[in-house]
Amino acid sequence: MIKLQKLKLYGFNNLTKSLSFCIYDICYANTNDSRNSYISYIDEQYNAIRLTKILKKTCSIIGANVLNIFHQDYEPQGASVTILVCEEPMSMEKIDALNKNIVSSSVLAHLDKSHICVHTYPESHPQSGICTFRADIEVSTCGIISPLNALNYLIHQLESDIVTIEYRVRGFTRDIHGIKHFIDHKINSIQNFMSDDIKSMYDMVDVNVYQENIFHTRMLLREFNLKNYLFNINLENLEKEERSYIKKLLSKEMREIYYGRNISR
């Protein structure tokens, strides 16, 4: 758990902390039917109900209280979940008042700043057989709640080939002497808050803007086992040349996503 510096604050902690994930799952399917089957499979694996369970557990880990949940599966594919959260428990009377358009100023502040959401994007290449699944997740909180406490849980739950993570702290809070504090904990890398087993699984690179309190980490899975990337294909049925071709194709796709640019070779 992240330990915040003990500052004597004047009023509410107005810092907004946002942790954003962009995760990718890659596979190879050599026919149109297989590609369609993969998209259907991954769409079911990451349906709105399962994603809601993951995000509710995230709320529990960071110590947030759920105000409202919206989830939706889409046709032909994709899902979205949004959870509005607050730092302190909210009485049922106040929550029910939202349905009558009676909203206090304190609740408005929470709804504006504290939320957890996820959106999914399955897709496939029209010719090569490459299929990708992307999920965008954002955990945004205000007050003493830190989204970094859910970092390892979310990485483990999503089991991705490529992950890009951004953590940023916005705004400021004042202490009792009126001095502004633009961040309330020590950090020089998102990797500071990752478990050792995650660090051993991924190659990682940081791009941080310290003066703006913006921290960015890219992650690429180290172990590559071709068998794990084939959908409805038996590895033993592939010739050596075909295995090599598919491996190069997948490697190129993963490197392009990891570096965020097209690679010619």
Swiss-Prot record:
Catalyses which reaction(s): S-adenosyl-L-methionine + H(+) = S-adenosyl 3-(methylsulfanyl)propylamine + CO2
Site (Cleavage (non-hydrolytic)): K113, S114
Claim: S-adenosyl-L-methionine is one of the keywords in the record: yes
Entry PTM: Is synthesized initially as an inactive proenzyme. Formation of the active enzyme involves a self-maturation process in which the active site pyruvoyl group is generated from an internal serine residue via an autocatalytic post-translational modification. Two non-identical subunits are generated from the proenzyme in this reaction, and the pyruvate is formed at the N-terminus of the alpha chain, which is derived from the carboxyl end of the proenzyme.
Transmembrane annotation, as ranges: none
Active site per database record: S114 (schiff-base intermediate with substrate), H119 (proton acceptor), C142 (proton donor)
Needed co-factor(s): pyruvate
Quaternary assembly: Heterooctamer of four alpha and four beta chains arranged as a tetramer of alpha/beta heterodimers.
Protein name, entry field: S-adenosylmethionine decarboxylase proenzyme
Species: Buchnera aphidicola subsp. Acyrthosiphon pisum (strain APS) (Acyrthosiphon pisum symbiotic bacterium)
Species lineage: Bacteria, Pseudomonadati, Pseudomonadota, Gammaproteobacteria, Enterobacterales
Gene name of this polypeptide: speD
